[in-house]
Amino acid sequence: MINVSTEFRNEMTQDDNRNFIPYAEITLADGTVLNLTEKEIWQESFKIEDATSASGTFTIGAAVATKLTFTINNIYDTYSAYDFDGASIAARVGLTLADGTTEKLLVGYYTVTEPSYDGTTITLVCLDRMSKFNKAYSASTLTYPATLQTILQQACTDCGVPLLTTTFDNGSYSVATKPESDSLTYADIVACVAQIAGKFAKIDNNGYLYLGWYDFSIFEKNANLDGGSFDSASPYATGDTADGGNFTDYSSGATADGGTFYDQKYYHECYLKV
């Protein structure tokens, strides 16, 4: 979750103010630092793809890297001489508030994995620190048996990723022997730990690994109808009932108030995750 000011939240409720301003602080492999803004970043090219489950399915224990993509304006060959491969990026987005100031939000730390040069433009595909776990687990020197908590902590230490979640469900569960496979990576280990904990694994905007799950309490904030479950009764016995009324008197039937559009911020979380 990204904390923002009340003013930022208020601006997010205005339909005419969703013009986020991109910022990228790029540190090249040779130490050169480039600070890019909307003047250098191609319009509407700044995109972040995030997920807590595998594509096209619902998974427990997903450890999906967040991808940042943006295009740099290079019409005048300003950046042609720079090597962006492996560069580190601190990405931010800003929003202009009612008082004219700009509030900037840190949306993550990334590493350039696929730079492409097209003469007038340079496109950078970047992954967050979850990508640091993409190396062989055979390098681990951790002594087994080991608890899930110890396994996760050691994986973060070995891969240089700070850990935010130090305690979690089933964290004391002990694994008897070290998993052995030539294809096994630290990312696989992180995913396995998350699955046994009943969580997903993510990198937050500050670059820390955490285990989390979905907040279902938001669905109780308004007078919503519960659809129940596919129980064995016929007709289904669970869930709320609502009378649809009749076509003679359209005012007949049950009503349910789903709240206001402002209430929907809890579902979309547009101002929390960008």
Regions found by a protein language model. Give the residues of each.
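Extracellular beta-strand-rich, repetitive "passenger/adhesive" scaffolds
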Residues: 96-101, 154-159, 234
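N-terminal export/assembly leaders
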Residues: 134-137, 152-182
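C-terminal extracytoplasmic interaction modules
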Residues: 101, 167-189, 195-196, 203-221, ...
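Extracytoplasmic/secreted envelope proteins and their assembly/folding machinery
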Residues: 148-153, 187-190
